[in-house]
């Protein structure tokens, strides 16, 4: 298959590109490199630098006889969605509408969309099924839900003259290698790892008893690849998480232990809670098990160890790059 991956230079997208190429697919990548890194994209992919919110940029990638689109590109920071809501709206909603417009123009048979756990309310039952009410409490969650509705409504249009098969993945807290270590606005595990590597205090916002459902990147990629040609996923929404909860306090302790520290010898501080922070999060992954045949295989302990090994190496590489640039 010829597959376009938007956001393919980013954390999740680049791992998906790697797997697709290994399985023999031809992959087209588009990324604006706002948070993605060009070096994440394997040599076997056709690369376009551009913004999904610019339909002309996007159409360059669409003109490659595509069989499917994996739309992952987006603004993914809850905090930045509050400080810059128009950018959040432009990237997540307008960008998705642009993807849909071109899917219609080119009669795209298949679209997979990266939705988010943030569309659920803090009062959702635990574990949370896909049928739970969607009442996002952050601007980011609002834009992800709006984009998801655009995707599903477009696929259900009675005036379409072709089969447009879509699947939406509500992804939980994805972690693993290539996660940002220097972005204080997204990815709590990456933030904590970056803090440790730079010798900075770990900051927990709120009381730390809020929970997250952490799922390893390899498991996420397996779900996406499996869904591409599986009719049971057409027109469906799936939660992608581990099905387990971990408090932010527990996460802090795990990360400290990974670096042979405890709270007694490393600074861990608390700060006021931030807006848009869901209190308790846990995915019900029954539908993914039944219809996708998917099961997360990587335990948090194993995934954390792999991520820490990568982070230590990446931090060293980044330091060497900075030193080399200063010497020029």
Report the location of each language-model feature.
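N-terminal Rossmann-like NAD(P)+-binding domain of SDR-like oxidoreductases, especially those catalyzing
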Residues: 1-174, 313-314, 325-328
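Residue-level signal for the nucleotide or nucleotide-sugar donor/cofactor binding architecture
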Residues: 53, 83, 91-94, 131, ...
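C-terminal substrate-binding subdomain of Rossmann-fold SDR/epimerase-dehydratase oxidoreductases
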Residues: 197-328
């Amino acid at each position: 298959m010829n597959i376009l991956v938007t956001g393919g230079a980013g954390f999740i997208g680049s791992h998906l590109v790697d797997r697709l190429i290994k399985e023999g697919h031809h992959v087209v990548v588009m990324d604006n490199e706002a948070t993605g890194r060009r070096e994440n994209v394997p040599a076997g992919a056709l690369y376009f630098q551009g913004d999904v919110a610019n339909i002309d940029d996007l159409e360059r990638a669409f003109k490659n006889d595509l069989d499917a689109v994996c739309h992952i590109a987006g603004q993914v920071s809850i905090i930045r969605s509050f400080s810059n809501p128009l950018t959040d709206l432009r990237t997540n909603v307008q960008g998705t509408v642009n993807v849909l417009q071109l899917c219609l123009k080119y009669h795209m048979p298949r679209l997979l969309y990266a939705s988010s756990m943030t569309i659920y309310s803090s009062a959702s039952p635990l574990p949370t099924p896909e049928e739970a009410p969607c009442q996002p409490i952050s601007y980011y969650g609002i834009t992800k839900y709006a984009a998801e509705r655009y995707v599903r409504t477009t696929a259900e249009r009675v005036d379409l003259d072709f089969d447009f098969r879509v699947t939406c993945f509500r992804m939980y807290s994805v972690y693993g290698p290539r996660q940002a270590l220097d972005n204080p606005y997204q990815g709590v595990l990456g933030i904590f790892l970056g803090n440790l590597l730079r010798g900075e205090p770990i900051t927990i916002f709120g009381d730390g008893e809020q929970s997250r459902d952490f799922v390893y990147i390899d498991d996420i990629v397996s779900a996406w690849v499996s869904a591409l040609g599986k009719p049971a996923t057409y027109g469906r929404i799936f939660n992608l998480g581990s099905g387990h909860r971990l408090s932010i306090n527990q996460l802090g302790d795990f990360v400290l232990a990974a670096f042979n520290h405890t709270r007694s010898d490393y600074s861990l501080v608390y700060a006021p809670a931030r807006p848009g922070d869901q209190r308790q999060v846990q995915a019900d992954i029954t539908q993914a098990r039944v219809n996708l045949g998917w099961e997360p295989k990587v335990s948090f302990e194993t995934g954390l160890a792999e991520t820490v090994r990568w982070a230590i190496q990446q931090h060293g590489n980044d330091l060497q790059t900075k030193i080399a640039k200063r010497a020029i």
